[in-house]
């Protein structure tokens, strides 16, 4: 019982399509090798899958370029002539653009002005003025941007300086005050005689005969 006839149409499932392509490609390559060996033919095959993967086969006695050259000789035409002519036209167009730009540059530098008419000179002057305004605008923009950047750096440096000053000020403040027997209260400073007064304790008189006496330096008990 023979196999049923397969309808030739595009396989919608991508996986099935790729599997079928791989199998058929292998079969075509096998037939091409058989033709090369059995019939001494020059065969070239170039294939691209739907995913863009490239495959080729060429008889060992030649190469792809040789096959294309023989093909062009056989049909009497060139495969590259149209592309070559397009490249020539593109090159000529680019040369014209380059020549015009060089002429414009020289004219803006004050050269090659002898052949220009009044209207052309006036148009050139307007173009130069417009370019000058654009350059000035760009210059001022750069200056403004740099100035703002420098201001931010200066502000940041000043804030860091103030923070450092505050930290240093806190570190230099003494941890204790000392008693000033002269009635001045607490003093955070440290003089030459402050060490003796740092830990001064005042003795409160408890004897009746001591009531009413001034608390002078003779009634102070000092440590060390």
Curated annotation (Swiss-Prot):
Molecular function GO labels: DNA-binding transcription factor activity, RNA polymerase II-specific; protein dimerization activity; RNA polymerase II cis-regulatory region sequence-specific DNA binding
InterPro entries: MADS-box/MEF2_TF (IPR050142), MEF2-like_N (IPR033896), TF_Kbox (IPR002487), TF_MADSbox (IPR002100), TF_MADSbox_sf (IPR036879)
Disulphide linkage map: none
Pfam family, one: SRF-TF
Tissues expressed in: Expressed in lodicules, stamens and carpels.
Major subcellular location class: nucleus
Further remark: Inhibition of MADS16 expression by RNAi reduces expression of MADS4, and transforms lodicules and stamens into palea/lemma-like and carpel-like organs, respectively.
Record's subunit section: May interact with the K-box of MADS4, MADS6 and MADS8. May form a heterodimer with MADS4.
Name of protein: MADS-box transcription factor 16
Protein's organism: Oryza sativa subsp. japonica (Rice)
This protein's encoding gene: MADS16
